[in-house]
């Protein structure tokens, strides 16, 4: 137990640096806050809405045009009744104004910043400066293209979105344990390979030399 505690303490400083690095790799802004569940209400709402959309279109197989028209009709009737009741002063709450319904420029700016960030990252990967990252991107895209043959586009997007919303949070919560387990597995694998080399690989040239002398 003492060894485990010492090795866990040894990884804490590097773990905090990796956590900050992962947060900044995701943009370090609102998108990263959502992925790391900094605002649990907002992250939970987005996940719930995306899950509802996936359930309606993939499980229930609800027609998209029908769904869109019914949502618009629902909003029209809600605002119509709300405006009528608000004007007759039956309730104190007034319907939202047109300015309340407009999408703010900051939201559009956030969206376009994320698109620009993605384009810049894609360009950096394609330049070949980091061959390891380039290889990882090519393999990941190839795996996604193969997996896409077995899932619909919406299901695949849902799986990717759920992964993006859960993996960073779980990694941040159990990072020390995962880092310790990964480093310990790496050391054990290295010892096993060294043992295999010393007992099997290193004996092959000796066996070849003996056969040559006997010949």
From Swiss-Prot:
| UniProt domain Reticulon: residue ranges | 31-211
| Presence of keyword Endoplasmic reticulum | yes
Q: Does the keyword tRNA-binding apply?
A: no
Q: Name one Pfam family in it.
A: Reticulon
Which Gene Ontology BP annotations are present? response to bacterium
- Chief subcellular location equals endoplasmic reticulum
Where are the bilayer-spanning segments? 41-61, 62-82, 141-161
- InterPro entries recorded for this chain? Reticulon (IPR003388), Reticulon-like (IPR045064)
* UniProt GO cellular component terms: endoplasmic reticulum membrane
Domain of life from the UniProt record: Eukaryota
Kindly state which keywords UniProt assigns to this record, in alphabetical order: Endoplasmic reticulum, Membrane, Transmembrane, Transmembrane helix
> Which membrane topology term applies here?
Multi-pass membrane protein
Protein name per its UniProtKB record: Reticulon-like protein B14
The primary gene name is RTNLB14
């Amino acid at each position: 137990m003492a060894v485990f505690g010492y090795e866990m303490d040894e990884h804490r400083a590097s773990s905090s640096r990796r956590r900050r690095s992962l947060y900044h790799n995701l943009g370090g802004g609102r998108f990263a806050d959502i992925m790391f569940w900094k605002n649990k209400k907002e992250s939970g709402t987005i996940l719930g809405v995306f899950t509802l959309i996936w359930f309606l279109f993939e499980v229930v197989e609800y027609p998209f045009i029908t769904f869109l028209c019914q949502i618009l009709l629902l909003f029209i009737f809600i605002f119509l009744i709300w405006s009528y009741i608000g004007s007759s002063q039956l309730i104190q709450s007034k319907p939202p104004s047109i300015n309340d319904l407009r999408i703010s420029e900051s939201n559009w700016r956030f969206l376009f910043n994320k698109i620009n960030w993605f384009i810049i990252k894609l360009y950096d990967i394609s330049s070949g400066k980091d061959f390891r990252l380039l290889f990882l991107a090519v393999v990941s895209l190839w795996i996604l293209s193969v997996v896409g043959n077995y899932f619909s586009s919406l299901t695949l997007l849902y799986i990717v979105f759920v992964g993006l919303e859960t993996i960073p949070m779980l990694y941040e919560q159990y990072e020390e344990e995962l880092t310790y387990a990964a480093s310990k597995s790496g050391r054990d694998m290295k010892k096993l390979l060294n043992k295999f080399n010393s007992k099997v690989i290193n004996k092959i040239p000796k066996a070849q030399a003996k056969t040559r002398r006997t010949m």
